[in-house]
C-alpha cells in the first residue's frame, strides 16, 4: 500500500525556541518544523550542540528575512572550565591537556579589558566555516588542521559573574561571527592554565531574549493536545525581528507600484538605510532601502495573500 504523503501547511512567522542541549540547530529546526507541519523553514545561525538558549526559527515568509537576524548581535552566558583544554574547545571534545589552576578573581578581571571592543579571532577548526567547499569540522575530524585567517569581531560586553574554584561564569555580548569557544580558549591561554567551554547559553539574539522563548517540551505538549494548529498562537509576526527598523506606510497607489518592483516616495522616510514597509491597511508587505534620490526601493517582498 502506497504511503500517503504528508501535506505541509503554509504558515509564516517566527518561533523563538529555547534550544535544548544535545541538539544541532538544524535538528531542532526540523523537529519544530515537523510539529508545526510547516512547508518552509530556516534558522538564523547555528548554536553548538552543547549550547542552549535563544534560537529564532523562521517559517514561510519569515525565511526571507532570516539573514538579517543572522547578522544581529548576540548575548551569552558561559561557564569557563579552567585548567583543561580539549580538541573542540568545549566539553564535547577529547581532553588534550590538564594543568593546575591558581587563578584569582583579580587576575581574571584584569585580563578581560584586552578582549573587549574590536578584536581579532582565529575561527576554531571545529566550526561550520568552509575551506574549498568542505566544512572545517569535517577536516578536523579527519585529523587535518588548516590555516584560518583571523576575523574582526566586536565584544561589547565581557563581564565576570562568578569565579568558584576552577570554573568562571562570564556574560558576553558580541557581534555576529564571534566564537565563544575561541574567546574562552584565548582567555585560558593568557592565564597560562588553558580553558574550555563547559556550558553555553544564548540569552539574546537580536531583539529577542530568553523571556520570549518556548521549550521543545512545551511545543510537543501543545502538539499532543491540539495538533499542529495549536502551535500557531506562538508564531511571532514575520517582521518581529526587524522592529528596530523605521516603519513606513504607503498609500494604496504607491503600494501597488512598490509591490511590482518600482521605487516610490514615502512621507517621513529616513535619508538612508533599510526600512519596513506597510500598505495603506497597515499590512506588512516587505522591506526596502532608501535610495540616494530619496525613493524607497523594494528589497524583499511578502507574498500577497
From Swiss-Prot:
Q: Which family does it belong to?
A: Belongs to the pseudouridine synthase TruB family. Type 1 subfamily.
Q: Which reaction does it catalyse?
A: uridine(55) in tRNA = pseudouridine(55) in tRNA
Q: What's one Pfam family the UniProt record gives for this protein?
A: TruB-C_2
Mind telling me which InterPro entries this protein's record contains?
PsdUridine_synth_cat_dom_sf, PsdUridine_synth_N, PUA-like_sf, PUA_sf, tRNA_psdUridine_synth_TruB, tRNA_sdUridine_synth_fam1_C, TruB_C
Which PANTHER family does the protein's record reference? PSEUDOURIDYLATE SYNTHASE TRUB1 (PTHR13767:SF2), TRNA-PSEUDOURIDINE SYNTHASE (PTHR13767)
For this entry, list what GO says about its biological process.
mRNA pseudouridine synthesis; tRNA pseudouridine synthesis
The active site of this protein is located at: 48 (nucleophile)
**Is tRNA processing included in the keywords of this UniProt record?**
yes
Protein's recorded name: tRNA pseudouridine synthase B
Task: Name the species this protein comes from.
Answer: Stutzerimonas stutzeri (strain A1501) (Pseudomonas stutzeri)
Report the superkingdom from the record.
Bacteria
Amino acid at each position: 500500500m502506497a504511503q500517503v504523503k504528508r501535506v505541509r501547511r503554509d504558515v509564516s512567522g517566527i518561533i523563538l525556541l529555547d534550544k535544548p542541549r544535545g541538539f544541532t540547530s538544524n535538528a531542532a529546526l526540523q523537529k519544530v518544523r515537523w510539529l508545526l507541519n510547516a512547508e518552509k523553514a530556516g534558522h538564523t545561525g547555528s548554536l553548538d550542540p552543547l549550547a542552549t538558549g535563544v534560537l529564532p526559527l523562521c517559517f514561510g515568509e519569515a525565511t526571507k528575512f532570516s539573514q538579517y537576524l543572522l547578522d544581529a548581535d548576540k548575548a551569552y552566558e558561559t561557564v569557563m572550565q579552567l585548567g583543561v583544554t580539549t580538541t573542540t574547545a568545549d566539553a564535547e571534545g577529547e581532553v588534550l591537556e590538564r594543568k593546575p589552576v591558581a587563578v584569582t578573581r583579580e587576575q581574571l578581571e584584569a585580563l578581560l579589558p584586552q578582549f573587549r571592543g574590536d578584536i581579532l579571532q582565529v575561527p576554531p577548526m571545529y566550526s561550520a566555516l568552509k575551506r574549498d567547499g568542505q566544512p572545517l569540522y569535517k577536516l578536523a575530524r579527519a585529523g587535518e588542521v588548516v590555516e584560518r585567517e583571523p576575523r574582526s569581531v566586536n565584544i561589547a560586553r565581557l563581564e565576570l559573574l562568578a569565579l568558584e574554584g576552577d570554573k568562571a561564569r562570564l556574560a558576553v555580548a558580541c557581534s555576529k561571527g564571534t566564537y565563544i569557544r575561541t574567546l574562552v580558549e584565548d582567555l585560558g591561554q593568557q592565564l597560562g592554565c588553558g580553558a574550555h567551554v563547559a556550558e553555553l547559553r544564548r540569552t539574546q539574539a537580536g531583539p529577542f531574549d530568553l523571556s520570549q522563548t518556548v521549550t521543545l517540551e512545551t511545543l510537543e505538549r501543545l502538539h499532543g493536545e491540539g495538533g499542529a494548529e495549536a502551535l500557531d498562537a506562538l508564531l511571532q509576526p514575520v517582521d518581529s525581528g526587524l522592529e528596530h527598523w523605521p516603519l513606513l506606510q504607503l498609500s494604496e497607489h504607491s503600494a501597488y507600484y512598490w509591490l511590482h518592483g518600482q521605487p516610490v516616495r514615502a512621507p517621513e522616510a529616513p535619508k538612508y538605510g533599510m526600512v519596513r514597509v506597510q500598505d495603506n491597511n497597515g499590512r506588512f508587505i516587505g522591506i526596502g532601502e532608501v535610495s540616494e534620490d530619496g525613493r524607497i526601493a523594494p528589497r524583499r517582498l511578502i507574498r500577497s495573500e
